[in-house]
Structures are given as structure tokens and as C-alpha cells.
Amino acid sequence: GPNGPEDNMDLELSGSPSQMPEISVSRKEMESKGLAVSNMLEWIGPWGISYTANITSDSTTGIGNWTAEQFILCLRKGKYGGAPEGRNLLPPMPWPNFAQMTDDELKAVFAYLESTKPIHNIVPQPQLPVLAMKK
């Protein structure tokens, strides 16, 4: 816009766009120094690359098919997809902060997210740290 970059509210809560260009940094240097960098949708650090999730009500790429119980488990235990066997949530998701919320508070957040406009957006999968990859 005329005042510089503006948020696109049509994409609110839909996570990191799959077609977004990657941040141009030396991942090896970032990881070896324990540094992190972000554009607020993609985070690069010692854990690799993590992307913001689609938490809209979209039933295929968001949380539209989740139950309140899955949502609560995700934020209480830090498990992706709200499944006990799911992978751990990655930085920068501050799930321990949400873990202290009551069931009623988490259900209220979930109810709000269920009411959002469904936005179909396939978020990229997280990437392992380059220092952990076999050469």
C-alpha cells in the first residue's frame, strides 16, 4: 500500500503460504551459532525451519476437522495435530503458555477458531536442521 507493506486480512490465521520465498540466510551458520531469524511466518533456528500453522476452520488444511479435545491436547502437551503420538510442536509456538489455560478457556479459543473463514492453504512441512542432515 501507499504506507508500505500491509497485512492481508483475507489470509488471517491461514499460516505460512506454501508459495512464499524462503528467507535467504546461511542455515548452517545460524544453527551453529544458535541464532534464529523469522519473517513471522517462517522461523529458522537450531531446530531447523518451522512454519506457522493454518488454524482456520478449513477442513483439509486447517483445524476444521479437529475436536475440542484434540485442540486442548495440542496446547496442553505440545503435540502436533492434537494426537498423543504426534510430533512435538516446534519453536516459536509458545504452547506451554497456553497449557495453563482452563478447559473452558481453551474451548472458547477453539470455538472462535471454528467460526473463522476457512482458508485452504497447505503449509510447508518443517525442515530438519542442516547440521543434523547426513552429507
Model-derived features with residue positions:
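Residues marking the start of alpha-helices
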Residues: 59-62, 97
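Flexible coil segments in periplasmic/lumen-exposed cytochrome c-class electron-transfer proteins
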Residues: 1-50, 68, 80-135
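Mid-length scaffold segments of soluble, non-membrane domains
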Residues: 51-54, 61-65
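Short N-proximal segments of mature Sec-exported proteins
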Residues: 54-57, 74
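Glycine-rich, acidic and aromatic/proline-enriched surface loops and short helix-turn segments
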Residues: 73-81
